[in-house]
């Protein structure tokens, strides 16, 4: 059973005397180690299968672990409790619902259901949903629950008017759920903790049942998961936590990397084992990752190594702009294809979703098959399709398809019945739906479109986009949500202005009709959707857990990666560095780090310095490809020294600038 394990992995499998922390670097075989440890406990008679609780973070990871166990111990694997935290919480609720005041047929609400409840409460309490955005409140309730903050606790900290309203809604929300015999997704963690704290005998029963607790990806645990882990393991103290503090990149979801850093404080007698041998990457790639992450202060000291050999140097390219950056990727992909490399072995990583747009356009021009993982194709994203529908309606008011898409987007109180009646009326009088509008809220919508029509004749395309985002309410709706998802969608809408700006610079003053024709030619990606052999485009957050032979990381600039929002906070900058570590360690054989001297992003041109993360890698690991003569002939070279001259500069509000201490902003 221990065959094929290295000495550190064997040590981790064989140690079962008390708390164990396994710090497993990227590609160090942690899943294999964890699975073998479970099998060893059972095969050696140290535990019955039902005495083992293994927690993973995704259903996919749980299935993979279960399948591996089947391969080692056969049908006994069926009796091992392998699940996510939420699945385990649900099991506890089903077995103890009465003690928490629920009936057997309690309902689990999904995020859409809980949002519907919050919307109704906001309306019933008489609050303006434009000020007290239901989605923002729903997300805040979720955060509160993950931080173990009940309505009673939250009330103590509610000072502002908004927080007091938030407390009232939270309180009513909990009352409504209990009254309807319902729980939400976050309750699957919160209620088991409540159950254990209020019923010591129930806690003792589960502590005696689960004598060995193993938790994967411990660096990603939030407060509720951390407390649940401590409660269930308090008696046996035979808890094994596996993770890598250097890969903790989900703080925006409530994950607290300090849980793994504080493990030895929580369990004074804990043993720590480092898994540092990497089976994925070349030593050059690992040396680069080690050199970057060592600049973080909040970390466990470890050093990844491999017996694979040095491999190729890391390729660095400083492009002229984002278009040149994408074209570099295209050139290198073509070279790889000439060496019989398959598209599916290639990944392009970026910090924000909006960066995929230029890459997608260039790949479409070259007929290169690609897939966007963890998101939609840029032109398929809902907010982009909504914006294009507005533009099409402004251009052609007879476009019923576009009108039906946006007449109540964002919501403006025009219901399905009204729309149905309008459609019938238009059919009866033989006209477009737009022309059939004559009263009500739909007439206000029509007036907005008419105003935008007039403006379209005097504004540039980029200026028109800004007016559409404001007049339609799209920008206000997303800004009021105060969620990460809304922030990403807003970034995508702002990035659309880069398309119009680029189009205007290339073609001069153009009509809305010409622009709509242009994007209709580049937004169709259906041809390759069923082909598994495609290049993978994704954010660094989406790539965790994956690996590719050839990896391109684009946008390696200050303000992009690391992200502008992180530059003023040490903790956030360290998370950006962990993200960079994750990006680097996805590459098996071949890594390209790319940036641009100038970049048009969100409709604004930026001149960004090279990312500090590139500067943290020893130059002897890097093969540089920066050739001034390769700059596009029609564009001027930038004298970067101008950025640092001691003379007055005419700055305007909205300009992006670089400061030696504060970075880009």
Segments predicted by a language model, with ranges:
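ATP-hydrolysis module of ASCE/P-loop NTPase motor domains
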Residues: 16, 77-80, 98-187, 210, ...
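Conserved helicase NTPase motor core
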Residues: 3-14, 18-22, 53-54, 61-62, ...
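Inter-lobe coupling/hinge region of RecA-like P-loop helicase motors
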Residues: 2-6, 10-24, 50, 100-107, ...
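Conserved helicase C-terminal RecA-like lobe
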Residues: 159, 342, 356-368, 381, ...
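Mixed-charge, Lys/Arg-rich low-complexity intrinsically disordered regions
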Residues: 624-656
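Conserved RecA-like helicase ATPase core segment
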Residues: 2-4, 28, 36, 40, ...
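Conserved RecA-like ASCE P-loop NTPase motor core of nucleic-acid helicases/translocases
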Residues: 47-59, 80-82, 216, 242, ...
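P-loop NTPase Walker
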Residues: 1-104, 108, 115, 204, ...
